[in-house]
Amino acid sequence: MSMLLNKQLFFRDLFRSRKMLSWLKKICWILFFLLCMIKLYAQSEVIPGLFTTYQQNGRILWVIPDSLLGRDMSLTTTILEGAGRKKKSADAKFGYQGDRFGPRILRWEEEKEQIILKEIRSYVDTSGSYSLGSLLAEREMPLTLQEFEILGCEKTGKIIDVTEWLRDGKLWGLQPFSFLIGIGSEREGRVTAILGTPESVIVRSERIYEAVERTPATSANGEVTRWKLGCCLRLLPRHLMQVRYASSGVGYFTVPYAHMEPGSCQVISDRVVKRWRLEVADRDTARYRRGELVEPRQKIRIYIDRSFPEKWRPYVLRAVNNWNALFERSGFKNAIAGLMAPDSAGFTLDNSALSWIVYKASPMENAYGRPFVDFRTGEILSCHIAVFHSVFDMLCQWYIAQTGESEEEFPDELAGRLLEMVVSHEVGHVLGLTHNFYGSSLCETEQLRDAVFLHRHGYGSSIMDYMRMNYAVQPEDGVDMSDRIPRIGAYDSLAIEWGYRYFPGLASEEIQEKLSVWIEKKQLERKYRFQDSGGNLPEAQAEDLGRYSLETAELGMCHLKRLLRDTLRNNGRLSVESWNLAIRKQYSEYINQAFTYLGGIRKCWGNDSVIVVAVGREEQQDALRFLQTYVLESGKDLPREWWEGWGRETVRRLVEKADCFVGYDREYSVTEYIRDLGKIFRNVSGEECWGRFLIWCYTDCLMEYIQTERNRYPEVVALMEEQLKVMYRKTDKEKDVFWKAWRKNVNSIWK
């Protein structure tokens, strides 16, 4: 009996000792962890922010809060210092301080005692189909970018080591954008600083890349480029912005949008527009419904970088703030503001919450505006507007070529007003607006020369057209130079109201239906019409002007004639080469406008539909006469290098235009067109070098068309062969060496 009792006591003590040992082990682990954390806190640099960052002995640790697991974040990359290059292309658009790329949408998740970073590359709105939502989510699996071991836990999150990961140039460098900026493989990279805010973490680094030529992508003689970058990982709002479906009646940049309707098993593919999240605060909803102006919950603020030259700042600020009047049509006051960036630590180019206008030292004669968008809804998160230094050379060229002025000075006030116009156009882009090439066709030719009309109304419906200075104005019209510069117009106001009018309580589909009816009614007026790509629409071309662009092009030619007589004088700002380039560019624009009439179409807006009709016979014949006058006849008065290029290209395009007449019932038939074209070239004199050049070009183009399109367009080929035979018979008795060679050339096609 006593032996049995002793055994029971022995096993009881053994069990207790093992249990005690287990508790002791747990206590030791806790003490060890606490000691590690004390050491971590004591010897580390602590950077608070969206993620708490610990830096110790070259190691970088992040604490990923449990509350942020499953939340979406945006990652953008900004160039803080661009690389100096031995040779940089004049048309290089990217690679300068302030250039921003992205965003990529990332998400942190916890799986199997690991922290997983995933990239969201596609999105389907499943809110309308609860039963299929999880199934669809499985189909749209995010891409796993990185897996992190959990090193420890804090009260609010998990600790991971990001040291090596932050050195990876694929996510934290310029590798994804290498072709845009002309770099090759990365040679070296190091993290230089980490900054934190409650909403973001900014990782700054220095990286060295091999330089490559953009075309072809080969190493540029072993040259290396050094870059300073800032990558901003920013928390996105928990609730997505309400989408607005795209419409063909108004021009907005769009993103693809997949969604499911209630009770449906089918994924519907749509497009939604890019726009800022302008919403009415709950306290202001009643006032907004009554038609009172209210301030949006979150305003659009665009900061001008302090590197921007001081004398141009007022024009840039005005270019932004002028859009406020348009937002008032949408019910918002003070919706957008252009501001000078304060000289404080938080206002940095790599903070993706901030939008910037940056001045860039570059030979590129341009500017651009880029909105950075959450692709899931089209919400514009921020924007970047670049103004290149050499844009003033382009503005000066416009001034000379479109006004015929050749004074020795290009006044700063005029340059500033033109800069304001350029930046206003780019602000329109970062608000989501695309080009509207119908905007310049609003006015009659007489209105374009009426000083009183121009002062009151301007001369276009949209700043989003490629509409430059009013070249229809002649010196005797007495129009002030400030009234020859485009302004924000009626279409721009309509487009902003369409995109930013707030509809409390309505679903996106209801808003779409409401806006469709509204925009169709508005487009009965010319000033509210939209056309994104001109194609063969004479009224919707880049660089054109007026309802009848052939008339205004002839007026514009008057300026160029004066300049051509005065090519040795220039305004001092431009070189002779740039002076000539300005004239050549403008001359080419007028030629291009005439070509759109040949085989062109017009849109006629009605109450129920838009009807497409062919351009009339007289207008097309006028276009032919324009090309005959200003290229085929005037070419001999131009410098040889000009007319050789224009002459050959014009003749080729005239012949190929025959394609546009095939298969359509037109007032001006393909037969009439080819015969009219033949008459023009039969009347070209073969006595001069210029005439012989044109005749030979015309013949070569006809022969090439006959050989390549015989099976495709036999009717057209027969007409062209007829024209060759007519010209052959006319010159059959000519004994000149040129005509002998010409007949021999033609005979080769009939062998």
Predicted regions: what they are:
Residues 1-23:
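N-terminal secretory signal peptides that target proteins for export/translocation
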Residues 32-41:
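Hydrophobic h-region of N-terminal signal peptides that target proteins for export
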Residues 43-308, 326, 341-415, 419, ...:
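Auxiliary tRNA-acceptor-end handling modules of aminoacyl-tRNA synthetases
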Residues 69, 309-335:
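Zn2+-dependent metallopeptidase catalytic core
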Residues 321-332, 428-429, 433, 469, ...:
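Sec-exported extracytoplasmic/periplasmic mature domains
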Residues 340-360, 417-474:
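The catalytic-center signature of Zn2+-dependent metalloproteases
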Residues 383-414, 422, 472, 478-508:
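Polar, glycine-rich mid-to-C-terminal structural blocks
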Residues 440-751:
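Conserved catalytic/binding loops enriched for acidic/polar residues
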